[in-house]
Amino acid sequence: MVKLAKAGKTHGEAKKMAPPPKEVEEDSEDEEMSEDEDDSSGEEEVVIPQKKGKKATTTPAKKVVVSQTKKAAVPTPAKKAAVTPGKKAVATPAKKNITPAKVIPTPGKKGAAQAKALVPTPGKKGAATPAKGAKNGKNAKKEDSDEDEDEEDEDDSDEDEDDEEEDEFEPPIVKGVKPAKAAPAAPASEDEEDDEDEDDEEDDDEEEEDDSEEEVMEITTAKGKKTPAKVVPMKAKSVAEEEDDEEEDEDDEDEDDEEEDDEDDDEEEEEEEPVKAAPGKRKKEMTKQKEAPEAKKQKVEGSEPTTPFNLFIGNLNPNKSVNELKFAISELFAKNDLAVVDVRTGTNRKFGYVDFESAEDLEKALELTGLKVFGNEIKLEKPKGRDSKKVRAARTLLAKNLSFNITEDELKEVFEDAMEIRLVSQDGKSKGIAYIEFKSEADAEKNLEEKQGAEIDGRSVSLYYTGEKGQRQERTGKTSTWSGESKTLVLSNLSYSATKETLEEVFEKATFIKVPQNPHGKPKGYAFIEFASFEDAKEALNSCNKMEIEGRTIRLELQGSNSRSQPSKTLFVKGLSEDTTEETLKESFEGSVRARIVTDRETGSSKGFGFVDFNSEEDAKAAKEAMEDGEIDGNKVTLDWAKPKGEGGFGGRGGGRGGFGGRGGGRGGRGGFGGRGRGGFGGRGGFRGGRGGGGDFKPQGKKTKFE
């Protein structure tokens, strides 16, 4: 290796000085002076190669690393020349540029000052020179392949011409790997043919430099965009390979490695766009994944039940086909005298639904749970889907004002055709509310009309629709038939001595009369009178209202809030606590003249409702608005208009009970300032506010302390 370096010394010096100053040929004999000139020429030539700078961006990669490593060990310029000649190694300009090219990597390894100065220029010419290096060397075949590669690169570079001027330093890293192929063989051929071909090559160099500049610049820019980071390690690897100039196989391996690196770089460039598009693809994939389970759900739930009487059947054998399962399930129920309308199975065939003709068949079918179908014990239960809830709500009634001691059996005696009764309780105590489910919607409507106001355990029950009907009922205030026109009158202030026969004489067109009684068989002071049509009920209301029966003036109202749609001087208050007194009731409506609570004659206990009289309809209206949705003694009361029994007093003062410091407590009460009662100072309740109202305004809500 040392001998080769010496031989390359003399020859390399002559080559370096040859191109610009032809004095190199004359001074080739003196080696020491050429070394000095090489150093000086390297500095001067830095300016010259800048024009060709973009050409060699890629080539110097391997050469640069090798030159530096050898520079540190052997300062002679001979080795610099030996490694650098890529393709144009023989050409003198190539050698001149080679010396600076070696300095390119120096910023990391050697002096930083030289590296900065030479970075743009050296690498650029190094790439251009290799083009001729292979012609004089033994690797003529390699030169041809390199030229082909350059042509291919030129084609690729045409696409990237717009980006030529970007990143001058990055390009050398990628392309510098290829020209090194001919590097080891080039110096050997130069020793034999340099003297003969130098003149010719110099001329050729000058002619081709102009053309090669454009070609190389295009090539380097095309690959210069690629990330240099991956190619850098390959340079270090090439250093070890280039030290052994006699092994051509290693050069071939370098070529393969370089091609792989180039491919990797190309892939990186191509991957930049997909990375941006990836989120979109991922979103599509995510939506597809999300849509999949929904599609399954639709397949399972897609078929609507043919009847409202359906059961869920689980633990089916999924190894059987749909037809086999349907046939087996139908046969099972047919053997038990149950007619099946339809059988629907899920997509996984592990469960399904069975539709029956009637509620009786459904109840009988529930008893068959645990029987085997294709070796599996089936599970039968009522479905809990949204559709079944709507169906059940349509045929279910809500019963209110029930006795707290009422039982399901007692309700069953009243609602004989009820399919299910559910009492609502809290902390083990009944809330006086129950849900009564019937077999059909028609049965529910029939019971609402017939049993509305029925006395159960000493209390008059109030019935309401549930579900969508119940919501409409609340908006319209109708508690009677679904048509909204009540055929029933509610008679209040009835004498306790009055009987059903007495009322039949007064209301001749009545089709049904009910006089509720207490457990002791005594009348409660009110009655329900049903007529054949709404017109008959309305006629009786107009003709018999305020009629005196057995010493008392009766009050008639159409059942439901429609009967009390017109304001009067009297409010009907329902939902009172058993502990509420007339004094408390009157104080709750401060503008009231009088208040009375309906009590049982025998026991003297409250019936849960009462009446409050005012001096005028305006005062009553203001009080009603103030106490709407209000509470009295912890019970939420319901207000409605009633026909006054007597004349009022001296006028009301507005807001309801409560307010700051009132029964409503610190939160404003029901009638105070800002309270739910909407009464009080400036409230809808009117004049001066409720008992607790009108005081200092305290903002509602949580307090925030700042330390």
From Swiss-Prot:
User: What Pfam families would the database entry show?
Assistant: RRM_1
- Cross-link Glycyl lysine isopeptide (Lys-Gly) (interchain with G-Cter in SUMO1) - where? 299, 326, 586
Please list the GO terms describing molecular function: DNA topoisomerase binding; identical protein binding; insulin receptor substrate binding; mRNA 5'-UTR binding; PH domain binding; RNA binding; telomeric DNA binding
Span list, region 8 X 8 AA tandem repeats of X-T-P-X-K-K-X-X: 58-135
Q: In which tissues is it expressed?
A: Expressed in B-cells that have been induced to switch to various Ig isotypes.
InterPro entries assigned: Nucleolin_RRM1, Nucleolin_RRM2, Nucleolin_RRM3, Nucleolin_RRM4, Nucleotide-bd_a/b_plait_sf, RBD_domain_sf, RRM_dom
Presence of keyword Acetylation: yes
Phosphothreonine is found on: 69, 76, 84, 92, 99, 106, 121, 220, 369, 407
On assembly, the entry states: Identified in a IGF2BP1-dependent mRNP granule complex containing untranslated mRNAs. Component of the SWAP complex that consists of NPM1, NCL/nucleolin, PARP1 and SWAP70. Component of a complex which is at least composed of HTATSF1/Tat-SF1, the P-TEFb complex components CDK9 and CCNT1, RNA polymerase II, SUPT5H, and NCL/nucleolin. Interacts with AICDA. Interacts with APTX. Interacts with C1QBP. Interacts with ERBB4. Interacts (via C-terminus) with FMR1 isoform 6 (via N-terminus). Interacts with GZF1; this interaction is important for nucleolar localization of GZF1. Interacts with NSUN2.
PANTHER family cross-referenced by the UniProt entry: EUKARYOTIC TRANSLATION INITIATION FACTOR 4B/4H (PTHR23236), NUCLEAR RNA-BINDING PROTEIN SART-3 (PTHR23236:SF119)
- Protein name as annotated: Nucleolin
Organism for this UniProt entry: Mus musculus
State the encoding gene. Answer: Ncl
